[in-house]
């Protein structure tokens, strides 16, 4: 029996909608990372981008456990001396709630060239509406 390798012409992608309302951030992010990588499919090939497009709505209503709402800090650096910037979770939730899910999922992807293509299939929106209705996305029931 030979090992199956998926070809680029065999890739079939779906559009899925995930509702983030009252979901725990890390548990939701792991499921989204699995979907956009394509690991839930029997035709998964590590060297191919065979995952689905995922639309996340209600990102402003995501939950974190424990005291992370007060303690969690996001870091970025401008590559200039003294250029470390810190943003608290509460501030990020007020200004850019969609970035919280984006950074959580991006941190769960491998650090390689393929991950830059994979993360582009994640679309996160703070409210309930999204501009991807023409793709006729299916509702994905979050496990757990």
From Swiss-Prot:
PANTHER family: LARGE RIBOSOMAL SUBUNIT PROTEIN UL13M, RIBOSOMAL PROTEIN L13
Designated name of the protein: Large ribosomal subunit protein uL13
Single GO cellular component term: cytosolic large ribosomal subunit
Disulfide partners: none
InterPro entries recorded: Ribosomal_uL13, Ribosomal_uL13_bac-type, Ribosomal_uL13_CS, Ribosomal_uL13_sf
Gene3D superfamilies, sorted: Ribosomal protein L13
A GO molecular-function descriptor: structural constituent of ribosome
Subunit structure: Part of the 50S ribosomal subunit.
Pfam families reported in the protein's UniProt record: Ribosomal_L13
Keyword Ribonucleoprotein set for record: yes
Family that this chain belongs to: Belongs to the universal ribosomal protein uL13 family.
Gene Ontology process terms (BP): negative regulation of translation; translation
Biological role stated in the UniProt entry: This protein is one of the early assembly proteins of the 50S ribosomal subunit, although it is not seen to bind rRNA by itself. It is important during the early stages of 50S assembly.
PROSITE patterns: RIBOSOMAL_L13
UniProt keyword list: Ribonucleoprotein, Ribosomal protein
């Amino acid at each position: 029996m030979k090992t199956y390798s998926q070809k680029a012409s065999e890739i079939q992608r779906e559009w899925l909608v995930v509702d983030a309302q009252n979901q725990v951030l890390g548990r939701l992010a792991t499921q989204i990372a699995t979907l956009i990588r394509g690991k839930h499919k029997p035709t998964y090939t590590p060297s191919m981008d065979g995952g689905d497009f995922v639309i996340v709505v209600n990102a402003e209503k995501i939950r974190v456990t424990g005291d992370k709402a007060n303690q969690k800090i996001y870091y970025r650096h401008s590559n200039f001396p003294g250029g470390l910037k810190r943003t608290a979770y509460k501030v990020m939730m007020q200004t850019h709630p969609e970035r919280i899910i984006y950074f959580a999922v991006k941190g769960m992807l491998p650090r390689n060239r393929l991950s830059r293509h994979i993360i582009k299939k994640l679309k996160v929106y703070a409210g309930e509406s999204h501009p991807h209705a023409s793709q006729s996305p299916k509702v994905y029931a979050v496990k757990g």
